[in-house]
Amino acid sequence: MDTRDLTAYSAEKFKELDRIIAEAKRQSILDVLKGICDEHLAHSKNSIIALYISGIISLSKQLLDDSCLVTLLTIFGDNHKNQIVEHLCTRVLEYGESKLALRALGECYKTSGNEQLYDVWERLVRIDYEEAEITRVLADKYEQEGNKEKATEFYKKALYRFIARRQNAAIKEVWTKLVALIPDDVEFFYREQKKISEKLGEGRGSVLMQDVYVYYKENEDWTTCINILKHILEHDEKDVWARKEIIENFRCKYRGHSQLEEYLKISNISQSWRNVFEAINDFEKHISFDEGSFVFHRTWGVGRIAKVCNDELLIDFAKRRAHTMLLKMAISALQTLGKEHIWVLKSVLKRQDLAAKIRQDPEWALKVIITSFDNNCNLKKVKQELVPSLLSVGEWTSWSTKARKILKESTGFAANPSNIDFYTVRSCPVSLEEKLAVEFKAQKNFFARIDILNTFMDKADTDSDAFREMFDYFNTFLRAFSVVDGNVIAAYLVVTRVSTVLPHLNACRPHGFADLYAHIADPRLVYTEIKDKGLKWEFVNSVKNFVSNWSDEYVKLFPEVLSLEILRALMEEGYKEKALRVVEACFEYYADNRAAVIWLFKTVRMSLGSRSCALPQNSGLSSSSTLWTLLIGKSLTGGTPLRTENLTAGSFGTLWE
C-alpha cells in the first residue's frame, strides 16, 4: 500500500506488521524478509509496509542505516498524522534512545500541548550533543521553577554548544545567565572564555569577563578583581577602562598601606606611555614589602619585616635579627611570602606540631604546599618540602598514597591542563565531570586517556558534552588512518564497548574488526603496543570471534601472548595438532622464542606440581621437545598428571645439551 491511502493506517495496523516481524524472527528469516522489503523499495520507495518492516529489522540488528524510518516519519509527519507518528516513535524508542524518534515525538507533543514535552526534550539533549536551542529552553524552564542546579546544568550545556556553533549573541545571553547563577566559579569562566576566544577570535572571551568582574567588585574581592583585569589587559594592554579599574582596585586592596600612593606614583602605572605590565610588576614588588610581611632570602632563609622607614627595611631573620636593607636591594634579593606559605609555617610553628598536622590532614597539607608555589605543583615538589624535614622516607610512602588518592578524587583539586603531573587548588569545587575532562585534556598518553574514559563511565554522568568529547577523541582514530597499529585497534575496541553500552552515541566504525585485522602487518607487534591488559584480551578474543582463520592467527600470537587460554581455545575447537605444534615450534626455534620456552617450563612445572624441574643455567635447547609437548598437552586437556617427583633436567635425555 502506498501513501495515497494513509487513512488506512492505524496503530493496530503496525501491530499486525510487528507480529509478522516476530514470526520471521522465530523462524530465523529476518534477513530474508528484509531483503524482500528492500527489493520492493527499489521500485516503490514510499511503500509504508516495506519501510516499516525494513526499518524495524535494521533497528533490531543495530544497523546504522535509519533511512527507512526517516522516510516513514517524514511521510506521516508531513500529512499531520500525529497519532501515527507518536506510535512509530514509541516503537523505535523501545530499542533505545534515538535522536530521530525523540525529535519527532517532541514535535508531536509540542503541537498537542502534551505535558511530557519537556521530558522528551531532556532525553533528546542528553543524546544530541549539537542541539543548543532546546537545551537553552530547558535551562530557562528550570530557572523559572527555581531549580538552580538543573538550570546551571543546562545553561552550561547550551553554552558549550553555542560556542561550538560560534553563535556570539546566544553565547552572550547564556553567559549572563551563568554569571548570575554561579559567579563564584571563576575558574569555569576563565576556562570557557578561553574556548570562546579560540572559536570567535582573540579578545571575545576577555570582554565577557567584565560581567564576572562586576560581581567580584560588588563583593569587594579585590584580589580576584585584579586577576580578571590583568587577564583583560593581556588581550589589550591599551584598554583604558581596565587600566583605570586596576589602579582603583589596588587602592582598595592596600588602603591601609603607608606607602600606597608613593608606590603608585613611582610605578607610573597611571601613565599611558608606561607598559602596563611593567608598571603593575613594579607596584606589586614595592607594595609587598610592608610591616609584618614575610620574606625569603636564599642565605638567611625566612624573615619578617619589623619596620619600614622611607626606603629602608628592618628585617628579623631567624639567625640575623634587626637586619637593615634598602628597599631597592630588597626588591631584587628577597621573595615575599604569604602567611600560609609552607616556608613560613616551617619557621613559625614547632616542627612536631606541624608534622602532626600534616600527617593527620594530608588534604590541608596539599593545599598549603600547592598554593605556596603559584598554585601549580607536583608531588615531587611536595616531597621536597616534607622529606626529611617533616616526614621520614617511610612515612612519605604511606602519606603519598593518601595524597595521590585525594588529588585524584577530591573536587577541591584539578590537574593543570598543560601538564598532567601538576595540580592546582580550586577556589570553587569542580564537578567530577569537569575534573576528569581537564585530566583527559592534560593527559598525553593514549592508554592513560582510556583509563580516564573508563573512570568517567563508572563514576560520572555520561550524558555530558565532556564525555562526548572524550568519546570523539577515540572516534577520530577510526575515521582516517594509514597504518593499523595498537592505537587504532584499541580505539576500535573502546568505541565498540562504549557504543554497546550507550548506543545513542554516533560511533564511527566504517571497518569491522576483521577488516582492520587484515591490514595489520604484524599482529604480535600490535599486541605489544596495546598497553591496557583488558584491551589486550579483547583483542585476542576478537581475533577468535571475527577472523575466519583465527586458529592460524592464534598460532602466530602465542609466543607473544603466552597464555594457556590460547592453547585451550585451540584444543577445545578441534585444533589439537596446531596447539601441540606451536609448543613444539617454540623449542625448535628456541633462539627466537626464549621467553616462550621459559614461560612453558614454569607453566608445566606449576601445573604438574614438580619442584625439581629447574631450568639449568646457560643451557641451550635441542629440537627434541617431544616430552615437553606431551606435558603441555596433558596440562591442557586435564589428563592424568605424569609422575614428576624425581623429574630433573637429566630426565629429558637430549633435551638439554
From Swiss-Prot:
Residues 153-657 form the GRAD1 domain. It comes from the Bacteria. Residues 1-152 form the GRAD2 domain. This is Putative GreA-associated domains protein.
